[in-house]
Amino acid sequence: MKATDNTTTGPGWNFDNSYARLPDYLYTRLDPTPVRAPQMAIFNSSLSDALGLATNTLAGDEGVAIFSGNRIPEGAQPICQAYAGHQFGYFTMLGDGRAHLLGEHITPTGQRFDIQLKGSGRTPFSRSGDGRAVLGPMLREYIISEAMHALGISTTRSLAVVTTGEPVYRETPLPGAILTRVAASHIRVGTFEYLAAQGNRDGIRTLAEYTIHRHFPELLQADNPFLALLQTVLEKQVELVVRWLHVGFIHGVMNTDNMALCGESIDYGPCAFMDSYDPDTVFSSIDQDGRYAFARQPAMAQWNVTRFAETLLPVLHDEGEKAVELANRSLATFPDIFQRLRMDGMRAKLGLFTKEDADMSLMQDLLTCMQQNQADYTNTLRDLALETLPDTPFFREPSFTAWHQRWQTRLTRQEEPVEASRALMRAHNPAFIPRNHRVEEALAAAQERHDFTVLEKLLEVLSRPYDDQPEHAEYRQPPPPSEKPYQTFCGT
């Protein structure tokens, strides 16, 4: 969607707030609550440059004032978005309880991005919450979202974190902070569920049309644009979850309000990256039943897309039975698309340029071997690309040795040279992920000692995840056994 006003202000903002022109039942107009003594904790200069902003200006007092909510930039129209969601399977009405969407910034190349403050004060959707956020979780989202971007995975980005100079009261007083999130949009499955719960058929049509115009204008040419929207959202979610699996990422809270229709990873609460391979891995303290465990993420994505399909039924077809038939036909494509993308990705991770029927068992047997021996997921796959395998207990295991011989034989049936396979593997198997103990180390230094050098060093390493970086080899190491099991928390 193109900007209607290309006026650029001093800091480089170029706001055109199309969502705020939608019916007001989708949001509430409200400014952020000012804070006492904001300071810049971290500022993403490279992202600022990419957005066409005046980086030098925003890195100083001007940025602190804007990113804290103390100053509304010219052209912004702050709103709090309404949405609902299925949280761990249970439906509830929600909304931005501690966030304000400043508006949509248009880059010099015509790209449109939401600029949202998170932790910016109470809203009509806050319920019993205080509308504030704690420094640790905001820095955590900054680290993980930027790492995901470097890994090549579609994600929201983090432009800045400011401290507020005010305590936030959880179990104990903690330093308050506000994150500035950059997203293609914040249209969620839960946004459609909010309208469906109210029986607002016209609202569903309006929001669906807006989503198509904003994100998928090519669908306007489809025979049934709303059905095409469902199929496109489904395919984007499959692709996203497959990419998560390939790097060992566990979102932790795949509620429908945390599924963005644009296909970006969003809301990095109790997320984490898997160390030793186990498909049942759960990190979130609130996921007691393992609903969002590593291997269950594809099924949960399909469940979420099904909830989206239900909201679209009134606009898919005038006849109810026909609408259900169309939706089910689209939803039925999920398993095959997932299997194809999953296998394509795993072939690349194993250096395979060609397809054979036995590739599925080759992949699964490796994962089973890794699980049985508690092998590190990231390091094992990365090290397979080496000419000589490291002398580790796992690589000496008879079960792995037998698998390795099968894999070597499979490689010989390709025309591509071995070095081409190794290059393919290095491009698809990161050497560096945000190791949980390294993330906690950086957060502790920032929160307890106000030392951001540990975090900055971690971000530097994570910005080049596919490079060997032998000088940073310690960042590849899994946590010592004494630090397991690792547990994450929501941070709300």
Swiss-Prot record:
The keyword Signal does not apply. Pfam families: SelO (PF02696). The active site is at residue 257. The keyword Metal-binding applies. GO terms for molecular function: AMPylase activity; ATP binding; magnesium ion binding. Residues 466-492 are annotated as: Disordered. Its cofactor is Mg(2+); Mn(2+). It catalyses: L-seryl-[protein] + ATP = 3-O-(5'-adenylyl)-L-seryl-[protein] + diphosphate; L-threonyl-[protein] + ATP = 3-O-(5'-adenylyl)-L-threonyl-[protein] + diphosphate; L-tyrosyl-[protein] + ATP = O-(5'-adenylyl)-L-tyrosyl-[protein] + diphosphate; L-histidyl-[protein] + UTP = N(tele)-(5'-uridylyl)-L-histidyl-[protein] + diphosphate. ATP binds at residues 95, 97-98, 118, 130-131, 181, 188, 267. Its EC number is 2.7.7.-, 2.7.7.108. Mg(2+) binds at residues 258, 267. Keywords: ATP-binding, Magnesium, Manganese, Metal-binding, Nucleotide-binding, Nucleotidyltransferase, Transferase. Residues 466-475 have a biased composition (Basic and acidic residues). It comes from the Bacteria. InterPro entries: SelO. HAMAP family: YdiU_SelO. Belongs to the SELO family. NCBIfam families: PRK00029.1. Nucleotidyltransferase involved in the post-translational modification of proteins. It can catalyze the addition of adenosine monophosphate (AMP) or uridine monophosphate (UMP) to a protein, resulting in modifications known as AMPylation and UMPylation. This is Protein nucleotidyltransferase YdiU.
